[in-house]
């Protein structure tokens, strides 16, 4: 083959590779940008629409094997880049200024570990190179101040109107828990709660973010409705455990987001398997396969199956969640993979095109 024919064959082979996180070929994702020959072999630039930190060695090895299977044996150097775009939100709403994507983490039932999933998702995206914030929308029972090691700290206001978020482990955070005493109960009616959420979101100086993770309260009440009607959400993640009682409520949460035209990115099955802290024995104490069955039932992705491990609880309670406390541990890997799958699921959604169209102003004469 001529050099040009070789490069064309390499590009075709690369574009035929099915990325495990996207679930589609690199060609369909328009991810292969440049293919060239170098003195040492071949070079390819791959651009993906999700945070890719730490993924380059895995992808390079997989693509090398893929090319070898196609009969192309030349050494391959992969330049992997991330290009996170703003994605479409509910009709009649526009993305929030410098925040490209708002991702709601929700559950129909309390006690399934949703806040632990939300904070580790935010931290995993940060570790993978994204700019991330987290909004604790559980006004009645905020958990993020404790999990992020920020209990007792207060945000400042540069102008008396806006708040600067607190920063922990590289994540910008805002919570009602930063503004009230830790032991003060929030005895508020629905309108006060929804107003508080709106202010926390709109009056915080988030800066430029690729993702804003919203840690939702359990259920399908006022806060969820406010989020759907007033906040431009690019996608939702539903957290459940494998047991039937949790799955029943998770289904309600999923249907609620569908009803208000918020796309569901997928299901996270938390507490999927119990890991004994003494011997490492694993056991499905809450059942097995519930999250996978639910994902299949509703035609969405299973984003992750996360372990029930005493270390995860201890690390979150200590203000250093697992992704930060033990990033190379076996218990952290499912969180990192879950974050990559979630980012990839969002990357496949329709992009926001509003910035491409001029504003039309109708003046009366």
Label every model-predicted segment.
Residues 318-329:
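C-terminal boundary of histidine-terminating zinc-finger modules
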Residues 111-120, 142-143, 216-224, 246-249:
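Short glycine/serine/threonine-rich phosphate/pyrophosphate-binding segments
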Residues 174, 216, 229, 337:
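Glycine-rich phosphate-binding loops of nucleotide-dependent enzymes
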Residues 28-31, 36-40, 45-106, 339, ...:
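Extreme N-terminal, non-catalytic leader segments
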Residues 125, 130-188, 194-195, 201:
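Phosphate-binding loop that captures ATP/GTP phosphates
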Residues 1-33, 69-70:
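N-proximal, solvent-exposed amphipathic alpha-helical segments enriched in charged/polar residues
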Residues 102-139, 159, 254:
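Walker A/P-loop phosphate-binding motif and the immediately C-terminal alpha-helix
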Residues 57, 61-63, 206, 210-211, ...:
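Conserved catalytic-core segment of NTP-binding enzymes
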């Amino acid at each position: 083959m001529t050099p040009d024919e070789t490069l064309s064959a390499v590009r075709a082979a690369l574009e035929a590779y099915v990325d495990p996180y996207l679930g589609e070929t690199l060609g369909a994702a328009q991810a292969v940008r440049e293919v060239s020959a170098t003195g040492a072999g071949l070079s390819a630039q791959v651009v993906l629409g999700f945070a890719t930190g730490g993924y380059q060695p895995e992808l390079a090895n997989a693509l090398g094997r893929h090319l070898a299977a196609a009969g192309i044996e030349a050494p391959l150097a992969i330049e992997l880049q991330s290009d996170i775009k703003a994605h479409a939100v509910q009709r009649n709403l526009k993305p929030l200024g410098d925040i490209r994507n708002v991702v709601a983490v929700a559950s129909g039932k309390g006690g399934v570990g949703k806040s632990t999933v939300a904070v580790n998702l935010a931290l995993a995206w940060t570790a993978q190179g994204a700019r991330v914030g987290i909004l604790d929308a559980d006004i009645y029972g905020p958990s993020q101040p404790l999990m992020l090691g920020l209990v007792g700290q207060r945000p400042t206001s540069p102008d008396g109107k806006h708040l600067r978020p607190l920063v922990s482990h590289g994540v910008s955070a805002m919570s009602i828990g930063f503004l009230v005493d830790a032991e003060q109960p929030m005895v508020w009616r629905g309108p006060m709660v929804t107003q508080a959420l709106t202010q926390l979101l709109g009056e915080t100086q988030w800066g430029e973010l690729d993702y804003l993770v919203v840690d939702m309260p359990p259920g399908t009440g006022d806060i969820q409705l406010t989020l759907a009607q007033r906040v431009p959400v690019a996608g939702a993640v539903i957290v459940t455990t494998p047991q039937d009682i949790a799955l029943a409520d998770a289904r309600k949460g999923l249907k609620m987001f569908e009803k208000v035209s918020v796309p569901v990115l997928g299901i996270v099955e938390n507490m999927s398997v119990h890991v004994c802290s003494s011997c490492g024995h694993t056991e499905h104490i809450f059942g097995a396969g519930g999250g996978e069955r639910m994902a299949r039932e509703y035609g969405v992705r299973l984003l992750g199956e996360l372990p029930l491990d005493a270390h995860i609880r201890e690390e979150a309670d200590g203000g250093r969640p697992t992704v930060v406390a033990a990033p190379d541990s076996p218990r952290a890997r499912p969180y990192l993979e879950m974050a990559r799958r979630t980012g990839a699921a969002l990357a496949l959604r329709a992009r926001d095109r509003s910035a491409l169209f001029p504003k039309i102003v109708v003046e009366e004469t």
